[in-house]
Amino acid sequence: MKKVLLVLAAICCIAAVDASAAKKKAKHVVMIGIDGWAAEGIRKAPASDIPNIRYLMENGSWTLAKRSVMPSASSINWTSMFNGLPTEMHGFDKWNSTSGTIPSTSDNGHGIPPTIFTILRQQRPAVEMGCVYDWDIIGAISDTLAMDYHYFIKTYRGKETMITNDEYTKLATDYIKEKKPDFFTFYYGSLDNAGHQYGWYSPEYMECQKSIDRGIGLIIQALKDAGIFEDTIIIISADHGGKDKGHGGFTMLELETPFIVYGKKVKGGFEFPEPMMQYDTAATIAYIFGLDIPDDWRGKPMKQIFK
C-alpha cells in the first residue's frame, strides 16, 4: 500500500510540474527598461535609426500608448512596473522615492511591496535571475534580495559620459552568455539624462535612442550566441516620456510610452488596441512564467498578444 501511495504521490508531483511548465510561454524573459523613452521618440525617428526596435515591432506585439501612473516620474513608475500596483497602493509618490509616503497595501518582508522578482523567486526558487542598472534607485525598488546577480554602475554625470551605451551593454551581453538567465532586466538611464540635459526629441536625445537601439541589437545577438534566443521573450518598456527638458506633468508626451514584446508564442506585427497601464507590465511577465500574482496587484496581463 505504501508503495502505491508513493507512486501516486510521484505521479502527482510530475503532473504538477508538467502543468506548471505548460502554463509558461517561454523559459527565458529579458526585459530592457529605457528611462525617459517617450512614444514620440519612436514616431520621430527614421526607421533606419532604430532598426532593431523596428524589427521587434514588426515581428512582435506593441503599443505606443502604455500609460504612466501619476505623477510621471521615474521611481514612481518603475515601482508600478515592478510590483503591479498604482501609486495610491504602493505609496511611492515622490521623485527618487525608495520608500512609500504611506504604507503600501502589502509588504515582501524587505520593506517594499512584492515585485515580479519576489514572486518569481518564491514560486520558481531555482531560476537564474539578474538585473543591471545605471541608476541606483532601481536596486532599492526591485528587490535585489530575490536576485542571483545585480550590478550598478554609473554611466553619466550631467553632460559627461562616463561609459558609453555600447560599453555598458557589454555587461548585459556577458551575463546573458555566461548565465543564460531565466529572467534578466537591463536598465538604460542615459536617454532620460539626455532629455534633461538637452531636451526631449533634441538631436542629442535622438542620438542616444539610436545608441540604445544598437545595444538592443547586441543583446539579441548575445541571446543567439547563448543558444536561448528561440526560447526567449524580449520585452522593452519605459517609465515615462518627456516635454522640453522635463517630465512629471500630465501631458500625453509625458504619459505615453512604448511597450514592445517579441519572441516565443508572441503574435507578430500586432499593434494591440487595448489600453495598458504601467502596472500591467509585472502582470504580463508573471503570465509568461505562469505565476500566481498577489491579491492586491491591479495589473492585468496583456494576454491578447500571445498565440
Give the label of every model feature segment.
Residues 26-39, 56, 81, 120, ...:
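Beta-strand elements within well-structured catalytic alpha/beta cores of enzymes
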Residues 4-13:
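Sec-dependent N-terminal signal peptides
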Residues 31, 52, 208-252, 285:
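Metal-dependent active-site segment of extracytoplasmic phospho-/sulfohydrolases and closely related
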Residues 139-153, 170-214, 218:
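Active-site His/acidic residue clusters
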Residues 8-9, 18-57, 128, 179, ...:
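…; additionally, a secondary subgroup of soluble metalloenzymes is captured
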Residues 89-163:
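Catalytic-site neighborhoods of secreted/periplasmic enzymes
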Residues 82, 250-292, 303:
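Substrate-binding rim/cap in mid-to-C-terminal beta-strand-loop elements of soluble/periplasmic
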Residues 23-26, 39-122:
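Active-site nucleophile/metal-coordination loop of metallo-enzymes that catalyze phosphate/sulfate
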